[in-house]
C-alpha cells in the first residue's frame, strides 16, 4: 500500500511539472504572436504616412 501511494504521488508530481512546462511554453508562444502583431502594426503606422506624403507631393507637382 505504501509503495502504491509513493508511485501515485510521484506520478502526480511529474504530471504537475509537465503541465507547468506546457503552460510556460504556451505563454511564450502567445507572447511571440503578440509581438509579431505589434510589429506589423508599427510597420503599418510608419508606412501609411510616408506613402500619403509621397502621393500628396506627386499630385501637388502634377497639379502645377
Swiss-Prot record:
Quote any Pfam family the record assigns: FSAP_sig_propep
Keyword Secreted assigned: yes
Which interval of the chain is the signal sequence?
1-22
Q: Which domain of life is it from?
A: Eukaryota
Any single biological process term in GO: defense response to bacterium
Q: Tissue-wise, where is it found?
A: Expressed by the skin glands.
Which parts of the sequence carry Leucine amide?
62
Q: What residues does the annotated propeptide cover?
A: 23-46
- What function is annotated for this protein? Antimicrobial peptide with activity against Gram-positive and Gram-negative bacteria and against fungi. Has been tested against S.aureus (MIC=2.5 ug/mL), B.pumilus (MIC=2.5 ug/mL), B.cereus (MIC=30.0 ug/mL), E.coli (MIC=5.0 ug/mL), B.dysenteriae (MIC=10.0 ug/mL), A.cacoaceticus (MIC=30.0 ug/mL), P.aeruginosa (MIC=7.5 ug/mL) and C.albicans (MIC=1.25 ug/mL). Also shows a weak hemolytic activity.
Would you identify the family this protein belongs to, as annotated? Belongs to the frog skin active peptide (FSAP) family. Temporin subfamily.
Q: What is this protein called?
A: Temporin-ALg
Amino acid at each position: 500500500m505504501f509503495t502504491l501511494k509513493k508511485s501515485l504521488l510521484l506520478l502526480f508530481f511529474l504530471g504537475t511539472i509537465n503541465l507547468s512546462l506546457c503552460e510556460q511554453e504556451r505563454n511564450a508562444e502567445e507572447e511571440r504572436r503578440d509581438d509579431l502583431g505589434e510589429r506589423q502594426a508599427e510597420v503599418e503606422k510608419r508606412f501609411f504616412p510616408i506613402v500619403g506624403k509621397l502621393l500628396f507631393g506627386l499630385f501637388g507637382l502634377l497639379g502645377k
